[in-house]
Amino acid sequence: MKGYLSLSILPLLVAASPVVVDSIHNGAAPILSSMNAKEVPDSYIVVFKKHVNAESAAAHHSWVQDIHSAQNERVELRKRSLFGFGEEAYLGLKNTFDIAGSLVGYSGHFHEDVIEQVRKHPDVEYIEKDSEVHTMEDPTVEKSAPWGLARISHRDSLSFGTFNKYLYASEGGEGVDAYTIDTGINVDHVDFEGRAQWGKTIPTDDEDADGNGHGTHCSGTIAGRKYGVAKKANLYAVKVLRSSGSGTMSDVVAGVEWAVKSHLKKVKDAKDGKIKGFKGSVANMSLGGGKSRTLEAAVNAGVEAGLHFAVAAGNDNADACNYSPAAAENPITVGASTLQDERAYFSNYGKCTDIFAPGLNILSTWIGSKHAVNTISGTSMASPHIAGLLAYFVSLQPSKDSAFAVDELTPKKLKKDIIAIATQGALTDIPSDTPNLLAWNGGGSSNYTDIIASGGYKVNASVKDRFEGLVHKAEKLLTEELGAIYSEIHDAAVA
């Protein structure tokens, strides 16, 4: 199997290195793995301790490549001794990453003996076995029903009069960059109006194109002219999944790093006066797999660096806390709702789910032509509603270079605000440990302060109060009537 190789039992010839691995390390670093993820054979993510700086990280990279090369030489010698039959060489260092200094490390394809040496290195916090991730779409339902935008702009359940009416501020998304960390984007689609561009392709030897459609669909919901929440946002394709819709955790981490660095450069350029009108960045990650400490740390680090993040809760009808990045603390984790205001049958739930958004039968942009559309379902479709909402609200702030710039709307504050103004109690089939919150965009207002000041809204609270009042009145009248009847019976009996 090319690239995925079985482990060798040969001893490792350790090469000279610029660092010493000895007793100053307090025990070997742990190797983490997920019980509910498909591991990529012989592939690992190595995370450094907090004290590691750029210089020591570079020295470590050189060291690990030295011992990796020595191992490959031993493999080649063994192949010759066996007349060409033996294990193939390992691929070595793949990606290095540094996400705003909060998560530093690297990934690669290594022999187990190399990993044992790495475990003993004093700079290593932990090692995680690389695993597969995949899109969060549910492909079993395909019906055309573009209702999601209307739902997030109305408080009450959609009716015939509100079914296709999306209320929004026309400037929504302007000055905001949205990173779609997914399968790519059909950047030439007419619905993007030239606002979509290719950012980065992470998988090795892959093309700069969306061969799957999933990333394009999510991008349309974020910022499409017709299908998008934030219709003027800029889109950047960060391809971490191949056309099959699957990829590796290590590639996703590398994609997050690229998006964070791109965002931080924009922030610096805006403050230096090199660009005008930039207001901030958001990211959507409609993918997931088993629990991964590294992936959650990467997303959390991205949020800490100022990148507003939405992630899908997952489609297993299970506790979102058992999946990554859904279980990460800092992003907004999104479950899926239906047109009938139910929790979608596939949507994950639990305390790690922050909010719900439309995710069943969502119409959006697709691949194959500049005009292609498709209707698919999943928490993958719910998450970009929130990513679009993040871009929408960020755009209602003054730009970073503006004389009217106010205190920064941090990801932590915006997450809190979106949860605070959500429609409460609108959904059915919500477990008791899950927030019953449905996303709301402010109903077309362009005044962020007023939107937040309006607070949350409990569906049909007044109707419920009136109903309870009528019941109380009926009970009172019935009691009085029964009392009168009893008195008449009593009087008749006495007479």
Curated annotation (Swiss-Prot):
Propeptide: 17-136
Active-site annotation: 182 (charge relay system), 214 (charge relay system), 380 (charge relay system)
Domain Peptidase S8: 146-452
Entry-linked Pfam families: Inhibitor_I9, Peptidase_S8
Class in the EC hierarchy, top level: hydrolase
Protein's name in the database: Alkaline protease 2
Signal peptide: 1-16
